[in-house]
Amino acid sequence: ADTIVAVELDTYPNTDIGDPNYPHIGIDIKSIRSKKIAKWNMQDGKVATAHIIYNSVGKRLSAVVSYPNADSATVSYDVDLDNVLPEWVRVGLSATTGLYKETNTILSWSFTSKLKSNSTAETNALHFTFNQFTKDQKDLILQGDATTDSDGNLQLTRVSSDGTPQGNSVGRALFYAPVHIWESSAVVASFDATFTFLIKSPDSDPADGITFFISNMDSTIPSGSGGRLLGLFPDAN
């Protein structure tokens, strides 16, 4: 099975797998059952920003999701990613819809990782920024239903030609280049990721959510990982 660390922006409460009964953000370590969650006042049809940071000194993974002129949702969890993830990984975004649906539209995405080996050595960094997405985005690996549209957005799940979200869809987008996420000799390993997104739903209950995830390099969408499993995990264990 894949090794996954993720921050989930979960719009649908699947209480049978440990979700609270409201939209929430959560930190997932190798399981869809979040280690830590925080309530999230999801706003339909408004652009939001998600910001995720990790630093190996504090060994804390944190996420903030915010809308303009509104309170932010914040969640953090203490974890040593050296013990969880392989040394080389890929970073991606995933989303799903189920019986209920929503648009899972990504408008921009940036990521920076740094490895500092000692006080004299240079920092080894990887950085990318997408302020918009092109029709044939060669530096992204698109999986499942993920596509880039003519408006310069990344649609992680299926939408019809008039922009209506479709149910039972799963899609992911990974940056093509592997990321050196940790190294035994590194003094500090850190990363931060930011993406802006728009969730819009014709349903009273939107579903299912968006994640930022880090995985082994050859990760693919697991069979049966639609809906509540957010395109990341084969089961709810």
Swiss-Prot record:
**GO molecular function term, any single one:** D-mannose binding
**Which PANTHER family is this protein grouped with?**
CONCANAVALIN A-LIKE LECTIN FAMILY PROTEIN, LEGUME LECTIN DOMAIN-CONTAINING PROTEIN
The protein's name: Lectin ConGF
| Record keywords, A-Z | Calcium, Lectin, Manganese, Mannose-binding, Metal-binding
Q: What InterPro entries would the database entry show? A: ConA-like_dom_sf (IPR013320), Lectin_LegA_CS (IPR000985), Lectin_legB_Mn/Ca_BS (IPR019825), Legume_lectin_dom (IPR001220), Leguminous_Lectin (IPR050258)
Q: Which residues bind a carbohydrate?
A: 14, 99-100, 208, 228
Q: How does it assemble?
A: Homotetramer; dimer of dimers.
Identify one Pfam family in the record.
Lectin_legB
Naturally occurring in which organism (per UniProt) = Canavalia grandiflora (Jackbean)
The known PTMs are summarized as: Concanavalin A-like lectins of the Diocleinae subtribe undergo proteolytic processing referred to as circular permutation. The propeptide is split into an N-terminal and a C-terminal part, the gamma and beta chain, respectively. These are then religated in beta-gamma order to form the mature alpha chain. The beta and gamma chains can often be detected in cell extracts. Residues 1-118 of the mature chain, as displayed here, probably constitute the beta chain in the propeptide, residues 119-237 the gamma chain.
Further details from the record: Binds one manganese (or other transition metal) ion and one calcium ion. The metal ions are essential for the saccharide-binding and cell-agglutinating activities.
Q: Which residues bind Ca(2+)?
A: 10, 12, 14, 19
UniProt function note: Lectin. Induces paw edema in mice. Has a weak vasorelaxant effect on rat aorta. Has anti-inflammatory and anti-nociceptive effects.
The family line of this record is:
Belongs to the leguminous lectin family.
Could you say which residues bind Mn(2+) here?
8, 10, 19, 24
